[in-house]
Amino acid sequence: MGENKSGKVPHQRIVANGIEFDSKAEHDRYLELLVMERAGVIKNLECHPRWEIIPAQKIPGHRGFQAAHYTADFRYFRDGVEHVEDVKSSYTREAQDYVLRRKLMYLVHGIYVEEVVR
């Protein structure tokens, strides 16, 4: 796969079991988690769970702002503890919007997003 105009190698979206994954790495992690769920190691695997991290804002005399959300790659429970994961490359884990949203997840919901770097 060649580079695009920005010099980055584009990721390849994959659809499996009716679920769209942003990359092969995310799909591969899903397959790993499915095996773990079937083996009883984890429970309640969920793809692309979403949380509101900033509520919509109404500003008198203006349009206001829509709510901001964080969508993780996976959520599951292991030994009764909730785990939220995001699959990232070493490049995408540095994106400013991702870093901010990840921090807001912890601030607003008390949820630490675990990074799976591939």
Question: For each of these PLM feature ranges, what is it?
Answer:
Residues 1-118:
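Electrostatic, structured charged patches in enzyme active sites and in nucleic-acid/phosphate-binding
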